[in-house]
Structures are given as structure tokens and as C-alpha cells.
Amino acid sequence: MGLEKVLNTIKSLKTTEKVFFISILFSSFVPVYLSFYLIPQTLFSMGVGITTLILIIIYFYYFASDESKWLQRETFMLILVFILIFHLPSLYFGSSRVSHSLPLKDNQIIKGDKFFLGWIFPLGQLSLYLDKNNTVGPHTKLGMIINSFLQIFYSLYYIVPYIFIYILCYANCIRETVYRYNNNGNKSKKYDKHWSELFFILSVYTITYSLVLTINTIIPASSPRLYIQNKYNHQLNLYGISKFFNKICKDNGSANSFPSGHVAETLSIAIALFGMKRYINGTIALIISFLITSATLVLRYHYFCDVLCGILISIFAFIIPYYIAFKKERFEFEKNDNLNINDDDLEKIPYMPALNGEDTEEDD
């Protein structure tokens, strides 16, 4: 693929596609820069660089493909999303390595919690209040049931965003494949709209993930369960599989508390779905995000400021691609849908002979 062909491909991209491409570059090179700046000679950049190169090659190969090879394009898009699923978590492990070597900022974050919620909860921590509660505390049966339920949803964070994204991508591919198979290879009217939605939600999620990890690296913090563990009188007691999930999530070397990726990344998916007018999916994602957010506070994984910053990041990451690209493209798609009138719709329009140049009975 020559340079001229690559440049022509970039020029032909729609705005949502360009935003997605930029978000991929941002997700890779900002953490790499921070790694080199804070800890020289880190090997983290090598893995991210290779992953990014693979992403870019597939990305350009997908868009440079012949339009007639639509099945090839659909297949490569699935591969692109699949690699992205592995690409983003790799950034987490790299940024964690950087954060662990820096002084923690938990004390400053607790001051922020005390400012916002100190008049309600001890040190501004909901988990400390619950620890002393004899009704829903971690030492009560009701508290154990609630905590076990929340632990399951907390663990779902690691798969839920990718499930929503991949199902959306996979559904588009299947829908388009079936349509083209039944229509001599012609693309459907909603083909461009569906892929615009996919690039939009991918951009929102990638930007969110990148911002979270960047701030994680700049402002490292552990978590309430580690930094103020001596303040708690009771351990978290869980039932069944929740105990197993809690053991996996428990990391004594955590330094990525601020901001909360659990909150930011799940909420960004919910907001993006609402922006796409997929209200049912958006509501489901919002409920899951709310439960995950509750789990982060109740189970001592995050401070309130972690949650607050995560919410702000998700909103910011939504605004950028939505107002720069997706809103305008969605308006064009909706306008075209309103202008498209098929034969069945024409038959429903009342017959008005005078407008068709025919004489009416009154004229006779």
C-alpha cells in the first residue's frame, strides 16, 4: 500500500472514522510518553507500539479495501474490534507499572472526600459508615448478601463494556451479510449509519480508557481498602462465587484508584448508547453502571473523588466525538431516512387527482 493510497484513504474517511483513528493513537502514545518521561527505559512502550501498529495496519487495510469486497471489510472490522479489546487492557498493566513507583496521593484524595461528604460519613467514606452499621454492615447477614451481590457486578466491569461493543459490531456484520446475500451484494440503507454508531461508541470508550489511565499515572493512589484499612473494624465477608471474585480483584499493590475506571468506562458506554438513541440498551448499561459504581464505594475499592472524576471523564469523552462528528452524521442519516419514501408508503397517501393533472367531477 503506497503512501499516496494511504493519504487518499485518510481523506475519504468520515469524521467519526477520523475521530476513532485519533483516539487509537491517543490511547497508545500518551501512556507511552508518560512512561518514558516518568520511568526511562520501560519496556511497556514496546508492547503498546506493536499493538498499535497492528491496529493501524488493519484499520487502513479495512478502509482501503475494494468496496465490492464487503465481506472482507466486515471480517477485518471484527478483527479490529477484537484486537482493541486486548489493546486497551494492555495499557492498564503498563500504566500500573509506572504508578507503583510514584508517591501515592491518597491523603489528598481523602481530603477531597472529607470536603464533599465529611459531614455525612467518617472521612467522607461510605464504607466506613457501613462498617459500623449493625443493619447492613459487612458483619451482618444482610450486609454479606448485599456485598456478595455488588461484588459480582463489580467484577462484570472487566467484560461488560466489551460485550456491548462486540455485540454491536457482530450484529452489524451479521445484519449486513444477510442483507447483501439477499440483495445481490448491494449494501443496506442503514449500513453507513450502523458503522458510524460503532465508530462513535468505540471512540468514546477509547478516549475514556486513555484519560483514566493517563490520570492514574499522574495521580497514583491505592484505595480505601489499603490506605485506611486500619480504620475498618470488620472484614468483607462474602458468599459463594463472590468470594472467588473478591480474591481475584484483591491487589495489595494497586495504585490506580484515581479516577475510577469502573465508573468512567461503564458510564461512558451507557451515555454513548443514549446518544445513539438506543434507549433500551442504554438503560440496561446505565443500571449496570450504577450497580458497579455502588460496588466501588461499598466494597472499599474507590474513594468518592475517584467516582466523581470518573463521571466527569465519561461525560467529557462523550462530548468530544458526539459534537465533533456523530451528531452531524446522525442528523444527515435521519434526514435521508425521512426523505426516503418507498412504494408502500406512496400507496398510503390519499389520491388527489387534481394534483396529477386529471379533471375532477366538478370540472365536468
Where are these regions (language model features)?
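Intrinsically disordered, low-complexity cytosolic terminal tails
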Residues: 344-364
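N-terminal transmembrane-helix/juxtamembrane module of multi-pass inner/ER membrane proteins
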Residues: 3-51, 69-163, 182, 186
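Aromatic-anchored segments of alpha-helical transmembrane domains
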Residues: 26-33, 84-90, 209-214, 289-298
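Interfacial segments of alpha-helical transmembrane regions
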Residues: 74-80, 162-218, 227, 285
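Membrane-interfacial alpha-helical segments at the cytosolic side of multi-pass membrane proteins
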Residues: 163-171, 263-281, 285, 312-321
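Membrane-interfacial catalytic/cofactor-binding modules of polytopic membrane enzymes
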Residues: 215-276
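Aromatic-rich transmembrane-lumenal/periplasmic boundary elements in polytopic membrane proteins
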Residues: 88-112, 206-235
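Interfacial helix-loop-helix junctions of multi-pass membrane proteins
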Residues: 223, 257, 292-317
